[in-house]
Amino acid sequence: MSFELELKRIRDEIVQNLPPEITVTKIEFEGPEIAVYSESEDVAAIETSSTLKDLAKVMRKRVVFRWNVDKRKDPAETKDYIMNLISKDAEIGEITFDHTRGEVIIESGKPGLVIGKKGINLKEIRTNTFWQPKTIRTPPLPSRTIQLIRGMLKKERQTQKDILLEIGKRIHRPALFNNLNIRMNALGGFREVGRSCILMQTRDSNVLLDVGLNVGNPNDRFPYFFVPQFSIRDLDAVIISHSHLDHCGVVPFLYKYGYRGPIYCTLPTRNLSTMLQLDFIQICDKEGTPSPYSKRDVKNAVLHTIPLSWGKVTDIAPDIKLTLHNSGHILGSSMIHLHFGKGDYNFVYTGDFKYQKTRLLEKATVKFPRVEGLLIEATYGGPQDRIPSRQESEKELKQILNSTLKRGGKVLIPVLAVGRAQELLIVLEEYISSGFIDKVPVYIDGLISEATAIHTANPDFLSSDLREKILHQGKNPFLSDFFETVSSQDERADIIGGGPCIILATSGMLIGGPSVHYLKALAEDSKNTLIFVSYQVSGTLGSRIIRGFREFNYIDWKGRTQLVKIGLKVFTLEGFSGHSSRSQISQFLRRIQPRPKVVIVNHGEESKCVSLSTMIHKKLRKSTKSPKNLEVVLLK
């Protein structure tokens, strides 16, 4: 069956299932959505919930209604109508119009007031203007990344519409084969931590799960793209579990070499990935090393990204449906559920996950519609990986901070910009405001402030407790006056020469960035303290210090090398990790519903992957595999 015949079949099915008073003028595949255009003014009939639900149930596809251009109200009149309808308490900012898709985009500090109780305001806007309203949140902290992305999408709306139409054609093409064979190709991140990349293949489709960098080994950065089964031309989709560079850092590289398909991830993951990819280009420029991609490639990736909410079933290929679920690792991080064929096989990729609620995030999901195969991480999957509880680690952190500050020292905490940084900001705000530690400056350096601004724009992805504080109690710990952002070398010099303080700086593994600069300045003074709170990839300076190395070579901006002795105190607080411990992995596997038939282990040092795989097989009586990079696993 050709694409045109498939389009006609779907159109006929939609018309048959709509009320007779609704006139359909055009149907388009906009990416995974079917856009139905109408000239009917009887919006109430279209808005009837049973009609939409019944249609989606029959079609098994996402359907959105739009009105013809000549039916839409004048933009100026529509804007006036919205401003008169919505309370001033909603803090409406810019109102813009996407003429290519018939949407009015309303930016607001309080989107809930724009939406109204049970969506009443959105319904009023649709009924009276024939525009589809869409709300976006104004970040309480200004974000350069969000501003850049929103400006780009506003400028390139026709380009994005054209991209969606092309993606839609590929998604909704007829499947050629009835017999479903599924292969999982290990292209990176197997028996190692870094460059996560999994190629899922059927006879009809090719989908990549994560495309990451090897951050600990700049000489071997990329996944194994050279294998014969991988072809950029044949890729149907790329799905990103979360925004850390070892999972998303190579995405723009695909567009540099011809990929023109979609990226699926959550909205926070898109924004944070863009921030980190642009920063990676900057770091390469500063270090004088060639970047594997350009800002243009990052822009291309943004234009091809289709953000998804958790729990929303989405067609991504003729024989694959995707659903994202919370993984509890960092903001917007997701477990990836793939539904193959007509229920023939269901596969879950956990990505990095945390099966424990934290101050920042809810714990990972354990309930899925169906699961036959599970791919799970083993970062802390070794028998020796007994991570202390979060409460124990917070208590120890408090003691370390107090002892360091009382002896007049400074505390350096290297952190990844996304995840542990925000968790620590919440803890430190409570410690200082409650008087648990002395009121000293808390300096934030590197990308932390920008990443935190993106967190403030996405409260719906935060833990229920934190969301309640921010949205309903007006208490946002990220806006605390205790935190001071550092933005220049002069400010860093003042901090180093100043009194007791706490410094949060990137990078978390001491592979570059201001954290290395601070370490060089503070390292030899025994009054100071260095605290690690996140996983240190093998080969990084952070990993070497944890293993007992007490000196390192520091290269200054002129390229001169200096040997630095480490005399400060060093602590590791693994309880703040965003990864699950071995016991938490076991709990997850005992509680996941339904139980998978086969469990595959990745994302861990070789010994940990093998050990975890063996434990799961023996104790949980599951068929397990711990493949190496380049191995292929036949799932069905």
From Swiss-Prot:
Q: What does this protein do?
A: Terminates transcription on the whole genome. Termination is linked to FttA-mediated RNA cleavage and does not require NTP hydrolysis. Cleaves endonucleolytically at the RNA exit channel of RNA polymerase (RNAP); the 5'-3' exonuclease activity of this protein degrades the nascent RNA released from RNAP.
Q: What's a single GO MF annotation on this record? A: RNA binding
The residues that hold Zn(2+) 1 are: H242, H244, H329, D352
Origin species, per record, is Lokiarchaeum sp. (strain GC14_75)
Q: Does the UniProt entry include the keyword Methyltransferase?
A: no
Protein name (record): Transcription termination factor FttA
Q: How is the cofactor bound?
A: Binds 2 Zn(2+) ions, which are required for nuclease activity.
- Necessary cofactors: Zn(2+)
Positions of the UniProt region annotated as Beta-Casp: 384-577
User: For the region KHb, what residue ranges are annotated?
Assistant: 73-140
Region Metallo-beta-lactamase C-terminus: which residues?
578-636
Q: What class of enzyme is it?
A: hydrolase
